[in-house]
Amino acid sequence: MSKKHHHKHDHFEIIHKDCGYGVHAKVSVVKRESDGKLLIWKQPVSSNPEHQKAFREEIKRSKYWRKFGISHVKVCWYSDKHSLLKTYIKGKTLTQILKDDSQFFSKTKSRSLKALGKFLRLLIDSRHYIQNLSCKNLVFDGKKWHVIDSSNVHDRESRSRTRREYKRKFFETWSKRLHSNNEIHYLKSFLEKYCR
């Protein structure tokens, strides 16, 4: 990595500056000086108060993710009280996995697919529906899947409603990344097995 990508900022070194952009934030990967741990630094894209509101909501959502065991990501205010620091999860997103392996859902014995099934059951059993849980917001660290970002979280009265919503949403979202009817068939089988 060339030195032009390294910048000092208070107690961490910026490794990848502005490597991602969203509605509310630009994202950098940073290394904490005290222990060398990688973190995500989210800075607001402007001074609009809506960005701070979105950051407060993200902190709340991360507590929910940890409470139900669907992520180890912690989110907190940085010392400037305007930007966030988040746990960096090393691994591949579901988007990257599906791009690299179009046969992913047919490999029923793979560790990552079994872990994804277990992850789905945790989501359903929580009786909460996480909006906008896209492929790019799910990361596999080699052992388990983590939510790294999402929209709102909604309480659901019944497990069956939660199951139906996830099953429909995941099929709708994930099937767009598949290239054959055969793979779509395997996705349906996977969702039938784990979204019960």
List the predicted regions and their residue ranges.
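Protein kinase catalytic-loop region centered on the HRD/HxD motif
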Residues: 119-128
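C-lobe/activation-segment region of protein kinase-like
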Residues: 128-129, 141-196
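Hydrophobic residue at the +6 position relative to the catalytic HRD Asp in the kinase catalytic loop
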Residues: 133-140
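ATP-binding glycine-rich loop module of kinase domains
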Residues: 13-58
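Conserved structural core of kinase catalytic domains
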Residues: 72-112
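A conserved alpha-helical element in kinase catalytic cores
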Residues: 42-76, 111, 166
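Juxta-kinase regulatory segment immediately upstream of eukaryotic protein kinase catalytic domains
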Residues: 1-17
